[in-house]
Amino acid sequence: MNKIKIVSAAEMSNIIDKPHDSIGLYLSLESDGTDIVLVACDNSTGDAWVEEFYSTKDAMRWLERA
């Protein structure tokens, strides 16, 4: 299992923009304008699959299935 890295919103943006530079699993705490959301990025294959979650448990479960 890959280790999940906690990153800032700016770091997450860079990972999504240049996915082949940062292979791995990432989690970021961000705001969608009204709520705080967890942004999870499965970049284990360099494809930067991204999902938003309102629960840490759900975000971790999604990343750990990678």
Predicted feature locations:
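A short, charged, amphipathic alpha-helix used as a generic interaction element across diverse proteins
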Residues: 10-16, 54-66
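Short aromatic-glycine-(Arg/Gly/Cys) micro-motifs in beta-strand/loop hairpins
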Residues: 23-47, 65
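Short amphipathic beta-strand/extended segments with alternating polar/hydrophobic composition
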Residues: 39, 50-56
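Negatively charged, low-complexity tracts enriched in Asp/Glu with abundant Ser/Thr
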Residues: 1-22
